[in-house]
Amino acid sequence: MKKTLLTAALLLAALGAGAQESFVHERSNGYVWPTDPAVLEKLDQWQDLKFGVLMHWGLYSVPGIVESWNLCNDDWVVRPEGSTYEGYKQWYWGLSKVFNPVNFNPEQWADVFEDAGMKYMIFTTKHHDGFCMFDTQYTDFSVAKAGPFADNPKKDIAKYVFDAFRPKGFMIGAYFSKPDWHCEWFWNPYYATARRGINYKVSLHPDWWENYVTFTKNQLGEITGGRYGKLDILWLDGGWITGDQVGLNEILPEARRVSPGLICVDRTIKGPNENYQTPEQSIPKTQLANPWESCMTLGTDWGWTPNPRFKSARKVIGTLAEITAKGGSLALGVGPTPDGVIEEKAVVILKEIGAWLRRCGKAIYNTRITEHYNDGDIWFNISKDGQTLYAIYALPDGESLPATLTWTENIPKGQVTILNNGKKVKATVKDGQVTVKLPKGLADEPIALMFNLK
């Protein structure tokens, strides 16, 4: 069955679950501010960056299917016709024997995403399928041990990815799945596989669960303990394991001794370990006062799939403008190919985004929210010092630039600078409405304006 059908099923199931704002994963209904000054400082630095990349890469990339979820026994899952559940699982686990990214080139990734104007990165060290993209000593189900890439000098993939991005000034983030469907202490083979959660009662098998907690703490210790350098973000997925059930309160103090100010993102789990919220594949309806990030895909899926349908550069820029005007950041999902490169179609779009940001990035980076933040397709940000206002016209796909831009409130003082070409124009104000006449010759792209307020 084609991957797009599976993705559609996932979206329909999630959107029908009663989430108020139509997120694939509903964001937490509250926020607890950190008390550690180093974490608060790191969060403020992260909020300056605005634009990052979230890379899913693993066994699912080999056939180009949805990441891990075909293993799940949820009702929405669609597997190839005629395959049995157990047969499918064995086929999927067997992908570990053929995953061989011989063209693995993290330096190319770093170049591409730097050129796109991205400032932070998050890499999947382990997804729900349990396949580790780092050299762990606690399971052989890893790229460093299970298949042909185990003989490659770059077999500790996460290390080489992080090392490629650090010299370029990226904040470094490690994605880690709290559930592990390959681990016998999570899905124990004695029982049939339940849906996404553990398939046994902890009250009957407390030792199994304790083994799983120890296993998870050990792996998180490997990632955060210094072997992979200082981390800026620990991005934990699988919020259906709730609270502190995997020992985060024990892990984080040691992790923050190695990486002071480490931002912990315990997704969808309201509490002190969710340092920023992560609405998925959607944007909150209004501004949020707390730190947050929309994680959204460039295509339709997180991992690489054949013949992807990518968003246009114009669409991504408009999305970024809306997100930043509402106080958030954008983590854009781009999945490397099975052999280890970023495909050319994605590179072309990312280059276009980066070219716009090099001219207009002042309107995005190092900005904060302003009270009047939206007027139709125009989104407003203000500089961190509160002195300069920015207006971004998010030109919709398929449309040409209008001759004028108009909005209410946010009245300019003096001339308005068009960041796209550096030219200054006058703004006229009548009955509280601002009108800016655009000069001829501008490209059909989002327009960023800079001005001071009266």
Stretches with model-predicted labels:
Residues 1-4, 113:
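Positively charged n-region of N-terminal signal peptides that target proteins for export
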Residues 7:
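Short, surface-exposed linear motifs at loops/turns and structural transition points
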Residues 10-18:
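Hydrophobic h-region of N-terminal signal peptides that target proteins for export
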Residues 20-454:
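Mature catalytic domains of secreted/periplasmic carbohydrate-active enzymes
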